[in-house]
Amino acid sequence: MAKKIVGFVKLQVPAGKANPSPPIGPALGQRGLNIMEFCKAFNAQTQGVEPGLPLPVVITAYADKSFTFIIKTPPAVTLIKKAIKLDKGSATPHTAKVGKITRAQLEEIAKTKMKDMTAADLDAAVRTIAGSARSMGVTVEGVV
């Protein structure tokens, strides 16, 4: 018989830097899950990833206090900022532009994000990522 799911916990955790402090500790503690076990497993799975890169993680909590988790790809905004070496997006995105991104850079980001996106093909994924870039105040080149 399958385990009974009692809930899901969605968090963004820096790669290799999971520790029991907030927000991880309280989120897992209220479900009765072993916080240190999660931290050790998460840090072990994210060893090959750039340290500190925020990764969305979905933790499935079961009735017997066990859990499983799925690590997703980094948020598009983080990948865009990394690609064009930007600290933060524009405060007024449609008036003040903070940088430029090319189609080649967008395709690279779209290939990374593709497994977590619902886009039908690479071109649709590129357009989605381009929309995220525009809403950050980044000028998009090569995408209509």
From Swiss-Prot:
GO terms for molecular function: large ribosomal subunit rRNA binding; structural constituent of ribosome. It holds the Pfam family Ribosomal_L11_N. Part of the ribosomal stalk of the 50S ribosomal subunit. Interacts with L10 and the large rRNA to form the base of the stalk. L10 forms an elongated spine to which L12 dimers bind in a sequential fashion forming a multimeric L10(L12)X complex. GO terms for cellular component: cytosolic large ribosomal subunit. GO terms for biological process: translation. Keywords: Methylation, Ribonucleoprotein, Ribosomal protein, RNA-binding, rRNA-binding. InterPro entries: Ribosomal_uL11, Ribosomal_uL11_bac-typ, Ribosomal_uL11_C, Ribosomal_uL11_C_sf, Ribosomal_uL11_CS, Ribosomal_uL11_N, Ribosomal_uL11_N_sf. Belongs to the universal ribosomal protein uL11 family. It comes from the Bacteria. One or more lysine residues are methylated. NCBIfam families: L11_bact (TIGR01632). Forms part of the ribosomal stalk which helps the ribosome interact with GTP-bound translation factors. This is Large ribosomal subunit protein uL11. Gene3D superfamilies: Ribosomal protein L11, C-terminal domain, Ribosomal protein L11/L12, N-terminal domain.
